[in-house]
Regions:
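A generic structural signal for well-ordered alpha-helical segments
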Residues: 32, 144, 177-178
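Conserved core segment of the aminotransferase class I/II
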Residues: 66-131
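Helix C-cap/helix->beta junction micro-motif
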Residues: 34-35, 147, 181
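Conserved glycine-rich beta-strand-loop-beta hairpin in the small C-terminal domain of fold type I
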Residues: 115, 130-141, 145, 151-164
Length: 222
């Protein structure tokens, strides 16, 4: 087998909501160094940290660490697909070449919109959004408790992984939730074998309480 070219770590994590400590990221950077590989830290959910422990991998100051992030999540503009990456200086030229070949460029209106948002958005906006998402997580997991479901307690991002007895996270079961309960989710199987029993719910809608009620009714009748 070929040696790895990169280790990718998403923190805060989708789908688990885990926030990796600075020490864990440093350990991953060491593993990458031993393999002559890059550590790519995907920090797209950096503004959705409920733990207070998130630190950017940029603080490691390593020459084999790349950090990527996106305004699509932090500013709530997912359709714009605007983000950036921070590369070691000796890799910037190669990164630009590959980006040009794959993406060419993002749209100018999207860039202008993000620039305006960066200039005008106060820190209180991110605090308010975090509080809103945290409240949705609390309400949703309370409903999961009521129906006896197992779930992860997210430290960041806006997802909850849940497991329902006798209802694994397959594509077929997620389709059943859509058809019979009117709740859309992602099959855990999409995230690998370790998540096959789980279903991922995204809590970025103001109808979280309604979704929780529908799940309670659906699994209460099973």
């Amino acid at each position: 087998p070929q040696p790895p070219a990169a280790i990718i770590a998403n923190t805060p994590n989708n789908p688990t909501g885990a926030v990796y400590s600075r020490e864990s990221m440093a350990a991953l950077a060491d593993v990458a160094t031993d393999a002559d590989a890059l550590l790519v830290a995907d920090e797209v959910y950096d503004h959705f940290d409920f733990s207070g422990r998130f630190e950017s991998a940029l603080t490691l100051d390593r020459d084999n660490v790349v950090v990527t992030t996106s305004f699509s999540k932090s500013l709530g503009i997912t359709g714009f697909r605007v983000g950036y990456a921070v590369f070691p200086e000796d890799l910037v030229g190669s990164a630009l070449t590959r980006h040009t070949l794959v993406n060419v460029a993002i749209s100018r209106p999207a860039q202008a919109a993000v620039l305006a948002a960066l200039r005008e958005t106060p820190p209180s906006y991110h605090e308010s959004v975090r509080d809103t998402v945290r409240g949705r997580i609390d309400d949703f997991t309370a409903a999961l408790d009521d129906i006896g479901a197992e779930y992860t307690e997210p430290e960041g991002a806006f997802y909850v992984l849940a497991r329902f007895e006798g209802f694994p996270g397959s594509v077929e079961n997620v389709q059943r939730l859509i058809d019979d309960a009117g709740v859309a989710a992602m099959p855990g199987a999409a995230f690998g074998e370790a998540s096959e029993e789980w279903i991922r719910f995204t809590l970025c809608t103001d109808r979280v309480d309604e979704a929780a009620d529908r799940l309670a009714a659906y699994f209460g009748d099973r």
